Design a protein with these regions (language model features):
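A short, surface-exposed loop/turn module that caps and links secondary-structure elements
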Residues: 39-67
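N-terminal "first-domain core" detector
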Residues: 1-36
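Detector for short helical micro-motifs
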Residues: 34-37, 43, 80
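Sequence-level motif detector for i,i+2 pairs with an aromatic at +2
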Residues: 3-6, 58, 82
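Enriched for short, Lys/Arg-rich terminal
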Residues: 73-138
Length: 138
């Protein structure tokens, strides 16, 4: 099985959102849920969720993780290259919770991903102990 572990990237808004959520005790499970969702998965796993564009080779996905009181995550999967680009995440409940993002916000996340890929201004996402680590992509 080809795993995506070494090809998971994110943009600045995703990184900042994780850092902000970690500060709130309500969301202390954020790293564990994301690690469980991301770790040791085949690229086809990342096709699941709500397709926000019509692309089979470059699906832009909205995916709920952690159940009813969990999180909603947006990401782009580039199937042939086996790369995942995490765009944004937000809790569905709690003090920072919201039911959904607007279509305009989702479009902006997508544009930000495309620009970051082109400009190579992404962070590589890895697991360090029990936390996600964001290192600048070279």
């Amino acid at each position: 099985m080809n795993h995506c572990n070494d090809q998971i990237y994110c943009i600045e808004p995703f990184k900042k959102q994780i850092q902000n959520l970690r500060k709130n005790n309500c969301y202390k499970d954020i790293d564990q849920l994301l690690i469980r969702f991301l770790r040791d998965k085949d690229i086809d796993h990342f096709r699941t969720g709500t397709l926000l564009n019509k692309s089979i080779t470059h699906p832009y996905i909205k995916h709920d993780i952690g159940g009813r009181s969990g999180y909603r995550m947006y990401y782009l999967a580039i199937i042939a290259a086996k790369c995942i680009y995490l765009a944004y995440i937000h809790p569905k409940t709690g003090s920072d919770g919201s039911p959904n993002t607007t279509n305009e916000a989702r479009t902006e996340f997508y544009k930000t991903i495309a620009k970051a890929i082109k400009d190579r201004t992404l962070y590589q996402v890895t697991v360090m102990g029990e936390l996600l680590d964001f290192s600048t992509m070279i």
